[in-house]
Amino acid sequence: MHTAAAATPATSPRDILKAERAHLFAQFEQHANVNLLVTKLARAVDQALILLWQDEGMPDTCALVAVGGYGRGELFPHSDVDILLLLPQTADKALETRLEAFIGHCWDMGLDIGSSVRTVDECISEATQDVTVCTSLLEARLLTGDEGLYRTFETHYQGHLDAADFYQSKMLEMRQRHAKYQDTPYSLEPNCKESPGGLRDLQVILWMTRAAGFGSSWNELLVNQLLTRREAKELAANERLLKTIRARLHLLAGRRQDVLVFDLQTQLGEAFGYRPNAAKRTSEQLMRRYYWAAKAVTQLNTVVLQNIEARLFPTELGITRTINGRFVERQGMLEIADPELYQREPAAILETFLVYEQTRGVKGLAANTLRALYNARTQMDARWRRDPANRATFLSILQQPQGITHALRLMNQTSVLGRYLVNFRRIVGQMQHDLFHVYTVDQHILMVVRNVRRFAIVEHAHEFPFCSQLMANFDKPWVLTVAALFHDIAKGRGGDHSVLGMADARRFCKQHGIASEDADLIVWLVEHHLTMSQVAQKQDLGDPEVIRHFADQVGSERYLSALYLLTVADIRGTSPKVWNAWKAKLLEDLYRITLRVLGGATTDPHAVLEGRKEEARVLLRLAAMDPHAHEALWAQLDVGVFLRHDARDIAWFTRHFYNRVDTTLPIVRARISPVGEGLQVAVYSPDRPDLFARICGYFERKGLTILDAKIHTTKHGYALDTFQVADPGSGLVEPGHYRDIITLVEHELAELIARETVLAEPPRGRISRQSRSFPIKPRVDLRPDERGQYYLLSLSATDRTGLLYAIARVLARHRVSVHTARINTLGERVEDVFLLDGRRLTQDNKLQLALESELLEALAI
């Protein structure tokens, strides 16, 4: 039982506690000893509660008990203080009143109290029914009151505690908690307490071992041979780091805050001494340290819990089958036959994963295998990496027909992959706060590998049929796996990661004896892995010169197919939000056009133009149009219209506008987009300088995102503009409501264009917390194209509502006409490209400077 001196009249318990907490916070800022902080905070609250209990004259027959984390003797700066008011029997009205007054005074002291009032029998009953209550009482600690009553509670509690049942319940609870956080420690804003790899995963281990009598500290688990010395040291170090992060989060937020929110990541990183450099933000350096700790905790949690399970549930079931002299399968898990295998034969480390791939029915690695891998780090040195046998095994792992993704993920989880590929280790846990990627670099790479592999699996052929078809005809799929593994391996080093990664890939191919034909393709893919995406999304695919240049870069069908497959896998592996049907269409169009050119098709603009027109005429005849009805409209169209639209689009807008060539009123027509998502909208109207801005403003007010815009002015001064628009969650364009929205857009947009109103100020749309915390520095690049006829305007900035309208409004104000617009939204980042009429810009340098300045202002958050 603890005792404490009564407070003097001049100092209330609240004042004493407040002063002590402030002193401890200042001490922590100076020395950063988190274990001292949480222990002393708990002691300070102990003293305050004991003083209050005595001042209130609480009955000697009752006991005040600390439970939960507070019972463990730890309190974080703004954690709840969980207490149990233990009674010998159910309280009468008078005692209830006194207990309520006591709890009220606890709140008055500034404590966030979580209280329960129970008898011993009620405690046991609740603990039997609710594992959360059972866990809270597991760490109970007497503060003051009737010690005999508390000992009775302890005896009854221990007598009813079933370690095996407790283990099963906590395992289920942990799996449910992990599922809530998507089973990954690598979220953008992880919860340092609850996420996989967080403090809770460490507490689960100690709860289970305490309940089973195996120990309640890492040292006790070491003594009881549940941990090795290295594991105990690692667990203590990672626990200390996670506790420090949690304590600093509480202090920075001024309240209980366990989530590493974007708003606090930079400040938290600075508190740890990180500073930004050319390659990494402060927040990225902090999060890498967190992810490494969470990864280690996840790995050790799995190892230790499997060992606890083996102790609690000893099984008589023997080896299911012997695989070879080094490995056996037991209940679907791959075990090493000898705990010293890796120390004796380091080559068996990589063999583990090859056997895992090749052995049907094996679903994971057993606890003894995981532990042996964890403790074999010193074996995985430069000599081990240079061993020809290990190099052959690693290449064989990448060349297997199945199991590659799972094997590589296991290799990453056990840190074997980073120990074999040293440069891969450098990007493990590296987050990119670019508003684009939502995975760490290592997780992104493994996601891309997974996407490439799925193209080769028959069961997944329905997901991306065209990719699956190409992969089925690709002679060596493993080449793409190697390229995927290296495509972003040089991220965060500074410099061009494609060039640096290419050098890494070339070195790997040479060291692993990969044939020159395959090595050349791998190296080329790593160097050019962004090329196809950039051409498809930022250049004019209707320009034969663009296609000819890209075809020259690619050179062959094999290279084209490989690049296309890697590009699709890469974009889909950045974020669930980035891939859409429009990007799929652009990439597939570029693939098919380039394939025709590689097969000998002409890129002569005149031949392409005539071929496109003839295709459109055929479609118009099929639509029962008079063979000459289109001629009046087409006579007013320049070559660009026919080169930038495919035959189906030309036939579509021709059918709607052919008999309205000289209309005085705007005409708007819309249809379900041929790509399968969103709408395609065509506008035909007497031209005006602010037309593009008006249309942009309308779509943004409706919550529709413009993905692509093709802007043309006819020979007689009319605008013929087509737009590809999507619904990014506004709910406006939903299956079953297309007819209504098409009618609405056609009517409202035509009416808006016809009005002679001043362009409204662009809205300052709300931006996300992530965008506020990690804004993209706006960039404006304005330069003439090779022919000097147009100017290319490239922009990148943080996305927000109203941004495109703000850009269009600046262009309209300076009477600069837009010819094409490629709107590329990557998560919360935009990278837009506009082709502008160059006549006014060529004649006026001041206009160029004014345009760039005002655009930068419009892009600013």
Curated annotation (Swiss-Prot):
UniProt keyword annotations, A-Z: Hydrolase, Magnesium, Multifunctional enzyme, Nucleotidyltransferase, Repeat, Transferase
EC number(s) per entry: 2.7.7.59, 3.1.4.-
Matches recorded under InterPro entries: ACT-like_dom_sf, ACT_dom, HD/PDEase_dom, HD_domain, NT_sf, PII_UdlTrfase/GS_AdlTrfase, Polymerase_NTP_transf_dom, UTase/UR
Catalytic activity: [protein-PII]-L-tyrosine + UTP = [protein-PII]-uridylyl-L-tyrosine + diphosphate; [protein-PII]-uridylyl-L-tyrosine + H2O = [protein-PII]-L-tyrosine + UMP + H(+)
Disulfide bonds: none
Known function: Modifies, by uridylylation and deuridylylation, the PII regulatory proteins (GlnB and homologs), in response to the nitrogen status of the cell that GlnD senses through the glutamine level. Under low glutamine levels, catalyzes the conversion of the PII proteins and UTP to PII-UMP and PPi, while under higher glutamine levels, GlnD hydrolyzes PII-UMP to PII and UMP (deuridylylation). Thus, controls uridylylation state and activity of the PII proteins, and plays an important role in the regulation of nitrogen assimilation and metabolism.
Entry's free-text remark on domains: Has four distinct domains: an N-terminal nucleotidyltransferase (NT) domain responsible for UTase activity, a central HD domain that encodes UR activity, and two C-terminal ACT domains that seem to have a role in glutamine sensing.
Protein name: Bifunctional uridylyltransferase/uridylyl-removing enzyme
Gene: glnD
